[in-house]
């Protein structure tokens, strides 16, 4: 079984102007819709010992985009969900990944960016790969503007703050990170 979670809506407003109802509506469609659909298929995948789950995030969600606090929150929450389900699904034959597409669609055409040149048919091969036998586990695959790349979230190189760390040292330490 394969689940591709791709439902979405936009309710763009700056954080100061977005209503809680609009914020919740975006979370309900993007996050809770994906949770409900995936939950419905999960036990079947476990029983079959095989499955693929693809969540749809977004570069706007991952890196931020003005006026999209609700959208970014929902899209990053899906990445957190992917991270956990990839761990839980690993021993059960279930591969869980996230697609971060960048293409002009009906939903995004009003936000036209002259630098954006991607089309949905350039994203489709990424979806097919994430649903294939060769699918990776726990990967964020960006398919944007005719190019593919992975997006990784990882800690930077740590610095040793010594045995006693005093908060007033923070401003001097942060640039070293």
Predicted feature locations:
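A short helix-coil junction within the Rossmann-fold of NAD(P)-dependent oxidoreductases
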Residues: 13, 40-49
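Substrate-binding pocket helix/loop in short-chain dehydrogenase/reductase
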Residues: 14-15, 22-24
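Active-site loop-to-helix junction immediately N-terminal to the catalytic Tyr of the SDR YXXXK motif
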Residues: 18, 64-72, 84, 112
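Active-site helix of classical SDR
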Residues: 38, 74
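Residue(s) in the substrate-gating loop at a strand-loop-helix junction
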Residues: 58
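Active-site-adjacent segment of SDR/Rossmann-fold oxidoreductases
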Residues: 63, 79, 84-94, 133-135
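C-terminal helical subdomain
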Residues: 115-177
């Amino acid at each position: 079984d394969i689940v591709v979670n791709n439902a979405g809506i936009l309710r763009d407003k700056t954080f100061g102007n977005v209503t809680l109802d609009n914020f919740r509506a975006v979370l309900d469609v993007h996050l809770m819709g994906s949770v409900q659909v995936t939950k419905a298929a999960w036990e079947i995948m476990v029983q079959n010992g095989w499955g693929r789950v693809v969540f749809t995030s977004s570069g706007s969600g991952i890196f931020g985009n003005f006026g999209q606090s609700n959208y970014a929150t929902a899209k990053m929450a899906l990445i957190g969900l992917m991270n956990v389900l990839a761990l839980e699904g690993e021993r059960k034959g279930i591969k869980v990944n996230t697609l971060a597409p960048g293409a002009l669609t009906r939903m995004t055409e009003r936000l036209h960016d002259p630098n954006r040149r991607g089309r949905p048919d350039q994203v489709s091969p990424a979806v097919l790969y994430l649903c294939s036998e060769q699918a990776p586990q726990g990967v964020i695959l960006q398919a944007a503007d005719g190019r593919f790349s992975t997006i990784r979230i990882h800690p930077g190189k740590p610095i040793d703050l010594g045995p006693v760390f005093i908060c007033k040292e923070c401003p001097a330490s942060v640039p070293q990170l």
